[in-house]
């Protein structure tokens, strides 16, 4: 197995709940998702975010099968789940767990970070470089993000090359960049940005995105609607922390062996 294959294997094991042991004392992911729904509802009512308060809820029935219920509609059995997950985990649509492609409102003279595609690290890194720009010059026609957001390339071949990062230490906490990015913003104290980053770099997510590409050859993209409907496995928050720590240590060991 090559180092690249090993890295991919680690991330796939991680999102399937096979990298660290489950702790029965952890608060289950279902409780975490309920907090997310409550926070999302509050933000929508306060006008701080746009969206509908009718999320889908995915649960395991008495027959051990998963069902999805959207609003007042009848539950629908999910036949296309990609793999099994531990009982303390939960499945969720990305649109129901994070904000996707949010926008920012700032004073025109605010200095922010500007990130081009070439400045975003690929592979299994978490890196980027930026230029300083005034908000007036980048507020229109570009993607918006802020500290703590996770961004990833949506266009081929940058998507397959895993160009993605957690944006932190931005100028005045905000940034803008290439329109060829999708932005994921976790709700406060819910899903870890580190877990989101490793999820979008996982073989499952990359292969799913490739299957959903649209557009002409050489200009294919993972569209917003397809991203929103992506199924994501969510561990309990405590397990997310253990997972991310384990991934970091294992990737460091691989990097050390390569040097």
Describe each region flagged by the PLM.
Residues 88, 96, 147, 229-231:
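Extracellular/lumenal ectodomain signal focusing on beta-strand-rich modules
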